[in-house]
A protein has these predicted regions:
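Bacterial Sec-dependent N-terminal signal peptides
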Residues: 1-9
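Extracellular beta-strand solenoid repeats
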Residues: 79, 92, 106-108, 117-119, ...
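Acidic Gly/Asp/Thr-rich repetitive segments characteristic of extracellular carbohydrate-active
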Residues: 45-82, 86-87, 92
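Right-handed parallel beta-helix
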Residues: 104, 113, 155-166, 199-215, ...
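Sec-dependent signal peptide cleavage junction
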Residues: 19-35
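Right-handed parallel beta-helix/beta-spiral solenoid domain characteristic of secreted/periplasmic
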Residues: 98-182, 213-219
Length: 331
């Protein structure tokens, strides 16, 4: 497959780099302890119960639905027990689940054993809508998407240590009999980010995630198909909330294998018409583009299309892609 790099794409693919956790693990509270900055919730797919309050290992939740029903507060931590397997489930975060610069919301793990595994199998569906046709009118711009983790207008959130899949193999998947290249296959993601009604969405960190077997639609390139994909939709009331964009997105130490269509992408926006001139001013980039995007020390293998793309991210404000290895694209 011939690889076409879009304008604004950054990808330094350095052979021999391995994916290692270079960032210290999150510090978590002792069992059952609330701190001045938040509560720790526990989720255990084997021994937990959704009748529990989730605030200790002995009273852990069982399903991710209980996490989605919470209104997380600044400083809250959600810990998934290692060895847990969450079938047909997804995590979905909203604006109301945001942390603060001083007290981010953290999603991590506890216990011993394999990573907690979220096997979404086409569940976790949500409605993507850019609010306007895209620069290429042949590209799909609205419809259903299935994502293992959805981060919608959530800021100051940090997620680490999870394993995510979202393929068509499960008996519970409504598309289990569809071909790999079916033009009508549902769009799927490991992690999808959406900025819409929160102005500039600050500080999203994805660290040490293992994302594999995500069989999204091979044709719908801007419908958050693939491993990790962050987009910007038209705000409900831009005059009130401001221009939607990202600042401080960090994607690091992640391993992605057999993801389709994209590997990692950040920044496609409803404001695409601001970027159609030959030369883009610093003012345009700073106003409409996303800033401080860092993609580093990741490993990608068997990507169905583009590997890593930063789309309309501000070139002067620390957009960086480095120490990343790509093995091969799917032929």
């Amino acid at each position: 497959m011939k690889k076409k790099w879009m304008s604004g794409a950054l990808a330094l693919l350095l052979a021999g780099t391995t994916v290692a956790s270079m960032v210290p693990a999150f510090t978590v509270n002792a069992e059952g302890q609330d701190t001045a900055t938040g509560t720790t919730y526990y989720v255990d797919s084997k021994s937990g119960s959704d009748s529990n309050d989730g605030t200790s290992e002995s009273k852990a939740f069982k399903t991710l639905d209980k996490v989605n029903a919470l209104n997380l507060e600044p400083g809250d931590t959600v810990l998934l027990k290692k060895g847990s397997v969450f079938e047909d489930q997804a995590l979905q975060f909203t604006k109301e689940d945001s942390g603060t610069a001083e007290a981010p919301v953290k999603i991590s793990t506890y216990g011993e054993g394999d990573r907690p595994q979220i096997n979404t199998n086409g569940h976790g569906q949500w409605d993507l809508n850019y609010g306007t046709p895209l620069d290429n009118r042949n590209h799909k711009w609205k419809g259903k998407v299935s994502s293992s983790i959805l981060i919608k207008d959530t800021e100051y959130i940090e997620i680490e240590g999870l394993e995510l899949t979202n393929d068509r193999k499960s008996a519970t998947d409504t598309e289990k009999n569809k071909a790999y290249n079916d033009a009508y296959a549902m769009d799927r993601t490991g992690v999808a980010g959406v900025a819409k009604d929160n102005g500039t969405v600050d500080h999203i960190v994805l660290n040490d995630l293992y994302i594999h077997d995500v069989t999204g639609n091979v044709y719908n390139k801007h419908m958050t198909n693939g491993g990790i994909y962050f987009i910007v939709e038209t705000p409900t009331n831009e005059a009130t909330t401001g221009i939607a964009r990202y600042n401080d997105v960090q994607i690091k130490n992640c391993s992605l294998d057999k993801v389709n269509r994209w590997g990692i992408a950040v920044g496609y926006t409803y404001q695409w018409s601001q970027f159609t001139t030959g030369a883009l001013s610093d003012a345009t980039m700073a106003k409409y583009g996303s800033s401080n995007v860092v993609i580093e020390n990741n490993y990608l293998n068997h990507v169905g299309g583009d590997a890593i793309t930063c789309i309309w991210t501000d070139r002067w404000f620390n957009t960086m892609c480095q120490r990343t290895q790509l093995n091969r694209l799917i032929q």
